[in-house]
């Protein structure tokens, strides 16, 4: 809980939370804002919303084909790590609509034209395409927007009445950070194990959707930054900058309840959740019963 920033929250800004965590699952918009807010020293929904509206935090599909919050300035290298895997999954989903990636590529210029200078909901994208004589159903438009996220063209815009909107990445984040593939792998690995450690290699593979070879190599590339311990006959890893190791956080040692939102990183970012919560207090998913 120290690593996750739940015990002894120390961050001043919402974007600092998301950068520390690497990425935060965010399919439930209200729950995701709560997850960020509870990790801020002075929780503020207004501050979280402002970070989203200004693009300091973005919400999009990255890593696994699930909504995540990521730091806005990191969108280029984070989507770069995810593109291959996401496109593979979206191609599979697209088959249910008799769509191909080539269909998306043909429609991409029209979608970019519609989004240019605007932040639109999927319904508004649909309506503007219809006004141009392009007849598409909303599920197909959403599928095309997902493809656009996967290739880095499209990101989140400013919410409209609590609804997610889309914008062009080049307009929203013109100064996105660029990293080489190896640098990006190392940075994602560093962020995961400092904020989610101790964790296993299998936990990291589950969270990041990297293949196990890439994950192993990324961990090895960090050298002495990584600390290894054994717990219940498993190898556990943690980054040397984790607050539980460097002793930079003061915590209230009294027994306290922590109310976590649905899909909080504390529970969803590990292959084996039994390390996080006692079996007596939960109904585990099938994968929780499989020891790594």
Show the residue positions of the predicted features.
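Non-catalytic regulatory appendages
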Residues: 225-279
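A short, conserved structural fragment
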Residues: 55-60, 152-157, 224-228
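Single conserved hydrophobic/aromatic residue that forms the stacking wall/gate
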Residues: 281-292
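Phosphate-backbone binding and catalysis cores of DNA-processing enzymes
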Residues: 1-123, 127-135
């Amino acid at each position: 809980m120290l690593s996750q920033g739940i015990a002894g929250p120390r961050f001043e800004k919402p974007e600092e939370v998301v950068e520390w965590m690497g990425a935060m699952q965010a399919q439930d918009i209200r729950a995701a804002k709560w997850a960020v807010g509870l990790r801020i020293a002075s929780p503020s929904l207004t501050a979280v919303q402002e970070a989203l509206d200004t693009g300091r935090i973005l919400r999009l599909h990255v890593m696994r084909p699930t909504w995540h919050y990521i730091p806005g300035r990191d969108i280029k290298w984070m989507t770069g790590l995810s593109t291959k895997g996401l496109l593979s999954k979206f191609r599979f989903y697209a088959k249910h609509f008799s769509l191909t990636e080539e269909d998306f590529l043909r429609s991409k210029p029209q979608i970019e034209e519609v989004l240019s200078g605007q932040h639109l909901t999927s319904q508004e994208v649909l309506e503007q395409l219809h006004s141009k004589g392009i007849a598409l159903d909303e599920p197909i438009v959403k599928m095309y927007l997902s493809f656009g996220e996967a290739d880095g063209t499209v990101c989140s815009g400013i919410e409209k009445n609590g609804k997610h909107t889309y914008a062009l990445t080049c307009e929203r984040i013109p100064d996105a950070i660029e990293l080489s593939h190896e640098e990006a792998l190392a940075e994602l690995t560093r962020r995961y194990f400092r904020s989610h450690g101790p964790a296993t290699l299998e936990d990291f593979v589950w969270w990041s959707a990297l293949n196990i070879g890439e994950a192993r190599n990324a961990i090895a590339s960090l050298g002495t930054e990584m600390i290894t311990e054994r717990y219940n006959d498993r190898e556990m890893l943690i980054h040397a900058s984790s607050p539980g190791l460097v002793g930079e956080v003061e915590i209230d040692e009294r027994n306290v309840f922590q109310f976590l939102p649905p899909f909080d990183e504390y529970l969803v970012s590990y292959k084996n959740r039994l390390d996080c919560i006692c079996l007596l207090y939960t109904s585990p998913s099938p994968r929780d019963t499989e020891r790594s």
